[in-house]
Structure formats: structure tokens, C-alpha cells
Amino acid sequence: MMITADFAGVPVGVGLSYDSYRKFFEAQQTEAAPAASVIVGEADRRRAAGFYPAGSTDAYIEYMELCRRVSDVLIPFRRAVFHGCAFIWRGRVVLLCAPSGTGKTTHYVRWKQLFGDEIQILNGDKPVLFARQEGDITVHPSPWHGKEGMGQPISAPLGGIVFLRKAAENTIRRVGAELSAGILFRQF
């Protein structure tokens, strides 16, 4: 079945062979004509299966591979799916970035405990970033919310990116463009 989902203003046709993950696309479904379309065929799923944990279902592999393909078709539209936990604080998005298992969700939960209703989750795993012509970046939801299922259909301008790494002590410091570029590119 082919559905059309809105990714930061770009309608993309998404081919779903399995109904089990369709619910994640519902908040972004649109009747607009797709600007691009993606599908993960059976041969593609078989090739990709080795990159996923043993026992991963074909439906799960399709769902995750669709993420990569959607990101690829969004690039010409100045948008990309980005790996990070995005939440809104004081009107701007804080994007927590780190390899899987580092503690992005844990860090978000701590912010939520400290700031309560000032914090709104946007997407817990893979938001869409839109680099506007004017130079600012806005952050938008995607169907890929992560294993915790955190996300809602809201968007806001990017306020900052926090790179996390495990350490014995909590510290924060500003990093320069040279160091941050390498870290950023691993998040796409």
C-alpha cells in the first residue's frame, strides 16, 4: 500500500508492504500529491537484514530502511532525517545527539524533571531538519520516534545541538566547528 506523508512540508509517497507500522505515519499523512516516493522491496529487505538484530521482522526492517530512503529523497528539498532526541525548551529545539545507547532519552527525562511543562518532546529519535533559504534551521516530527515512542506533530526553530558522551562527571562546553562537523555527519 502506498501512503503519502508530509516531511517538513514535502509530501513523500511511502510504500508499506506491512500494515504493522502504518500507525506511525498517521499523524503525517496528507492528501497532497507526492514530490517523491520511496519503497523497500523484498530483495532490499533481505540485503539489509544483516544490519539488524537477529529476529528482526521484515516489517521492522522495512520501517527502518524507509527512514534512510526518506532522508535521501528529502536532501534536494534542503531537509534530512537526523538521529537525535529533539525537544522544545523556551520556544526553541534542543537536539541531543549521540550514538544509540549513550543516554539521549535519559538526558531528555532529566531536562523534563528539571523544567517540567517548559519542555515538550518533538521527536525521540529521528526528527527532520529543514535548512531554510534564510539560513535558519527548523526541526519537524517524523514517524521514527525510537523505542520509547516519544513524538508529537509540532515543530520549532533549532536552538542548539548537544553532543553527549558517557563520562564519570557531567560537564558541558562549547565545541568548535571542526570538532562538531565530524560528530554531526555521523547523525545522518
What label would you give each PLM region?
Residues 49-55:
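Phosphate-centric recognition/catalysis
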Residues 65-71:
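Short Pro/Gly-enriched beta-strand edge/turn motifs at strand-loop
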Residues 31-47:
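Interdomain "pre-motor" coupling segment immediately N-terminal to P-loop NTPase/helicase cores
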Residues 107-108:
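Post-Walker A alpha-helix
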Residues 3-23, 35, 43, 56, ...:
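Glycine-rich, often acidic-flanked micro-motifs
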Residues 104:
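Conserved lysine of the Walker
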Residues 60-62:
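Conserved AdoMet
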